[in-house]
Amino acid sequence: MRTAGRLAVACWLALACAAGAPARGADLSELKVLYVGSERKSDYVEFLEGQVARVEARSRKAFRPEEARDFDVVLLDWPQGEETREMRTLRSPLGARADWGRPTVLLGSAGLNLAVCWKLKGGSGCTCLDPLAYDLRDHEIFERPHRIDRGRMIAIPTPKDFRDELEEPEIRVLPLVDDRETRRMPGWCTHALDFARYPDVEFFCGGVNSQTPTSAALWRQGNLLHFGFQESPSEMNENGRRLLLNAIAYISRFTEDRPIAVTPSVFAGPVARSRSTPARWLRHGELRIDSIKDVVSPETWAEIEGAGDREAMARRADELARFLHPNAEQILEVDPDLVALGVAFDDPAFFDRTLADLRSSDPAVAGRAGRLLRRYAPEGPGGADADAWTRWRDENRPYLFASDAGDYRWYVDPLAKRRGVPSAELRGPGRADR
């Protein structure tokens, strides 16, 4: 009787755990995973059975966000196709960005589609990713729970589209499939030149693609992990399947972090380029002048063009870059208020200068400072006086960072502020649950 009683209690506890709240920071075998999609439901469910504690699937079109409540990780499978053709009108199957807190792996083009809907990083790149991982960083995602065998990396000729930036005749890549010569649906890779400035973003690896060697294939923003490779588990080799499992395990630990920056996508409408774009494009010999001319205002272009040859123009564009700002048409132009201030909006001295000017007895100087603060620090106290702005700056100084990816503004890092850790020090795995 006692044995039967103990067995009954054990069974009850097992059922309670299976039906209860998500297991934060759990091992892979303890995780409850929900696949949201339609196209590859059987493949993912069959693969994950036996790997995780529980796996279920929901149709993407019928999915309700509250259905994810009892799961540790959601896999969103949302390919490009007829459903996503009108990207300006896309609606997220996960609901509103502000309401979604579940750790999520974005499979293939789900990273693009959700980025367009939610204005995330990931909305600029190309559907051109091959199943060849490149530039693997020294990161735990390649070690736990399964060690990725870097000894299986191979050398291939440097892709044509990488040669402008890489001088080496060969690069080393990790194949995620065995038959790498077979043509497949390409995955989604994201332009990643500015990733290092964002506290909530970490880059794990790139992949062979038809744009740049710096593009990201596997990376994280907040509680969202982008697994850009399009291949299903049944198409992958052992390293590919292990990498997918490691991605699920890693993102399960990020229930507190969230994407911070609001980054509009070029696929949803006009977006201002970053300030470095004109100079960078001028130094790219194959880009036509007209393409570069189109991203800046006529007045700004006249100043750049007057510098002389292409390299001289690039140098002048570099000089102007710190004062560039998008106008209402999302074209870059010189901000006269920044020129008068004498520093870029993302310069650490920006707040010291503007706050000093806000106390000026000259109405023109104080008015300019107020405009700059409202324009570049929209989370601040708006039209408040210098004392209120100074208190806000002092309260948030350790947690501030700036972005010019279409947004051109300062942000407060909410996780860093909540934990009382400077944003510059709270990066990568340090943002996982404690």
Language model: regions and residue ranges:
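Positively charged n-region of N-terminal signal peptides that target proteins for export
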Residues: 1-6
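Bacterial N-terminal signal peptides
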Residues: 8-18
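Boundary at the C-terminal end of the N-terminal hydrophobic targeting segment
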Residues: 20-25
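Extracellular ligand-binding/catalytic regions of CAZymes and related secreted enzymes
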Residues: 26-29, 197-329, 406
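Helical hinge/lid and interdomain linker segments adjacent to catalytic or ligand-binding clefts
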Residues: 30-116
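An acidic, glycine-rich "communication" segment
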Residues: 106-202
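Long, helix-rich interaction regions
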Residues: 129-137, 145, 289-434
